[in-house]
C-alpha cells in the first residue's frame, strides 16, 4: 500500500524522528550495538485507553449529576477528567485508524490521511496541554483553600473559575494549532518542554508549601494537647510520602515524553538518542497511565463523589433517575456551566 509511512505515524508531528524498527526487543543502531526497544502491543494500548475513557467519563458524569459537586474545585476536576478523556480518546482513535489502514479495511486518499493526521495531532496536543493546565489549576485552588481559607469563597468564585476554565481551553487549542503547524521549529518543541517544567515547578512549590503548613498545624495541635513529638514526625513522613507519590507519578508519566521532545531538538541524529526515539509509544502509554491514575488521586478520594458514582452506575440501567438524583443533568463537556454548591 502507498502512504505506509504516514499511516504508521499519524502522530508524527511530535515524533519527528526516524521510524523505529518494527521488531520488538533489541534493535541495532547504526554502529550495530544493541538498542533496547520496548514493544507495546496495540491491544494493550487500546485496553489502557478504554479503561481511561470509561473512568474519566464516570467522573464527569458524577460531577454533572450531583449539584453538591458544582463548585469551582470540582469544576477543575471535571475538566481535568474531560481533558484526560480526550487524551486517551484521541490516542485510541489514532491507533484504531492506523490498524484499519494497515489491514486495508479503511481505504482512503493520502490527502484525507493528512487531514486526519493534523486533526488528531491538534486534538491530542490541546488535550495534553489542558491536562497539564488543570493539574496546575487544582494545585492553585488547593493552595488558596489552605492559605486563604476564610477568603476562599470570595477569591475562587464560580464566575472566576469559569473564566479560568474557558481561558485554558481556548489557549490550549490555539497553542496546539500553532505547535502542530510549526512542529519542525526547535523553538516550538522547547516551548512545550519549558511549559511542562513550569507546571512541575509550580506544583512542587505549592504542594511543598502546603505540606509545611500542614506540619506546622499538626505541631500546634500536638503542643496544645501536650503530646510527644514522634507523632508529629510520623505525620510529616506520611505527608512527605504522599507528596513524593503525587509529584513522582506526574514526573514519571509525563517526563519521558518531554525528554523525547528535548532530545529531538538537541540530538536528533545521535545514536543514543535514536535508541530513545524508538520507544515513543512507551512514552504515550505512560501518559495514558497518568490519565488512569488522575481520577484515583483527585476525584475518587472524595466520599461525596464516590457516592454519586454509585448512583451513576445504577442510573445506567434506569434512565429516569437522572431527573431525580438531586442535581440538574449537565452535558459532560460543559464544565464551565457548573453552578455553585447548594447551601446546607
Curated annotation (Swiss-Prot):
How would you describe this protein's topology in the membrane?
Multi-pass membrane protein
Show the CDD domains listed in the entry.
Answer: 7tmA_MC1R
Signal sequence annotation: none
Ranges facing Cytoplasmic side? 64-72, 141-163, 212-240, 301-344
GO MF annotations, alphabetized:
melanocyte-stimulating hormone receptor activity
PANTHER family hit by this protein: G-PROTEIN COUPLED RECEPTOR
Q: What does this gene product do?
A: Receptor for MSH (alpha, beta and gamma) and ACTH. The activity of this receptor is mediated by G proteins which activate adenylate cyclase. Mediates melanogenesis, the production of eumelanin (black/brown) and phaeomelanin (red/yellow), via regulation of cAMP signaling in melanocytes.
The family this protein is said to belong to = Belongs to the G-protein coupled receptor 1 family.
> This chain belongs to which protein, by name?
Melanocyte-stimulating hormone receptor
Organism source for this protein?
Callithrix geoffroyi (Geoffroy's marmoset)
| Lineage of producing organism | Eukaryota, Metazoa, Chordata, Craniata, Vertebrata
> What's the gene?
MC1R
Amino acid at each position: 500500500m502507498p502512504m505506509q509511512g504516514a499511516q504508521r505515524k499519524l502522530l508524527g508531528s511530535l515524533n519527528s524522528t526516524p521510524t523505529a524498527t518494527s521488531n520488538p526487543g533489541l534493535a541495532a543502531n547504526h554502529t550495530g550495538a544493541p538498542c533496547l526497544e520496548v514493544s507495546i502491543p496495540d491491544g494493550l494500548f487500546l485496553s489502557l485507553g478504554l479503561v481511561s475513557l470509561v473512568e474519566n467519563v464516570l467522573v464527569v458524569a458524577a460531577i454533572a449529576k450531583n449539584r453538591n459537586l458544582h463548585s469551582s474545585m470540582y469544576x477543575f476536576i471535571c475538566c481535568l477528567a474531560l481533558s484526560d478523556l480526550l487524551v486517551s480518546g484521541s490516542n485510541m482513535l489514532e491507533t484504531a485508524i492506523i490498524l484499519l489502514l494497515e489491514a486495508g479495511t479503511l481505504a482512503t486518499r493520502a490527502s484525507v490521511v493528512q487531514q486526519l493526521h493534523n486533526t488528531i495531532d491538534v486534538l491530542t496536543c490541546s488535550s495534553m496541554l489542558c491536562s497539564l493546565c488543570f493539574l496546575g489549576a487544582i494545585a492553585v485552588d488547593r493552595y488558596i483553600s489552605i492559605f486563604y481559607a476564610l477568603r476562599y469563597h470570595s477569591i475562587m468564585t464560580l464566575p472566576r473559575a469559569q473564566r479560568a476554565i474557558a481561558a485554558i481551553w481556548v489557549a490550549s487549542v490555539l497553542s496546539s494549532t500553532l505547535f502542530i503547524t510549526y512542529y519542525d521549529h526547535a523553538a516550538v518543541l522547547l516551548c512545550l518542554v519549558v511549559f511542562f517544567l513550569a507546571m512541575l515547578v509550580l506544583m512542587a512549590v505549592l504542594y511543598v508549601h502546603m505540606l509545611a503548613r500542614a506540619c506546622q498545624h499538626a505541631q500546634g495541635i500536638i503542643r496544645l494537647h501536650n503530646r510527644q513529638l514522634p507523632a508529629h514526625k510520623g505525620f510529616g513522613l506520611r505527608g512527605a510520602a504522599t507528596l513524593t507519590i503525587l509529584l513522582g507519578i506526574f514526573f514519571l508519566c509525563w517526563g519521558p515524553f518531554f525528554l523525547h521532545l528535548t532530545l529531538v531538538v538537541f540530538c536528533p541524529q545521535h545514536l543514543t538518542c535514536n535508541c530513545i526515539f524508538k520507544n515513543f509509544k512507551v512514552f504515550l502509554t505512560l501518559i495514558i497511565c497518568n490519565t488512569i491514575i488522575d481520577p484515583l488521586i483527585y476525584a475518587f478520594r472524595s466520599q461525596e463523589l464516590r457516592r454519586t458514582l454509585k448512583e451513576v452506575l445504577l442510573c445506567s440501567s434506569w434512565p429516569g433517575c437522572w431527573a431525580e438524583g438531586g442535581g440538574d443533568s449537565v452535558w459532560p463537556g460543559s464544565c464551565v456551566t457548573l453552578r455553585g454548591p447548594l447551601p446546607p
